[in-house]
Amino acid sequence: MSEKLQVVTLLGSLRKGSFNGMVARTLPKIAPASMEVNALPSIADIPLYDADVQQEEGFPATVEALAEQIRQADGVVIVTPEYNYSVPGGLKNAIDWLSRLPDQPLAGKPVLIQTSSMGVIGGARCQYHLRQILVFLDAMVMNKPEFMGGVIQNKVDPQTGEVIDQGTLDHLTGQLTAFGEFIQRVKI
């Protein structure tokens, strides 16, 4: 394979010190040699979805830019916390805007989900709600291996903003390797 797979990360957290942000920032450093991982812009500036705004003003430039970067990528890694047993509102809002575009950026797109939390189950409930949403968008979600980073605060270095726990790094590296193989399998 001569060209690297282009993978983008979509961060579901808006918080500056986000543990999930730390996971996402670690991914480019541990990606297999056949893959390049780049972060998508923050979803913080995307306005709340409003069909009236869409009809009267069209799609926000932030949404159009996000969609184009997703379209250009070979795959998307969604890295997100779990809020109240589900998907964070900011991430759901970004997905709602993306779902309204005529040229669906996530349709047929390989997607990997990673969740982390300070609790022991690592955002598991969010993963399953997110999978339900992505079914509607016709995204191709990789089922296994899953990453649910429990007690993540003990596995990162807040000074460097990266994952430092070797077991977690090994799991994430293995998952990215599997995602690269998944992308190759489902590419049309």
From Swiss-Prot:
One annotated GO molecular function: NADPH dehydrogenase (quinone) activity
Principal EC category: oxidoreductase
Noted pH dependence of activity: Optimum pH is 5.
Temperature sensitivity of activity: Optimum temperature is 35 degrees Celsius.
Activity regulation behaviour: May be inhibited by divalent cations.
EC id: 1.6.5.2, 1.6.-.-
InterPro entries attached to this UniProt entry: Flavoprotein-like_sf, FMN_Rdtase-like_dom, NAD(P)H-dep_reductase
Subunit structure: Homotetramer. Dimer of dimers. The tetrameric configuration has a central role in chromate reductase activity.
Protein name: Quinone reductase
Gene: chrR
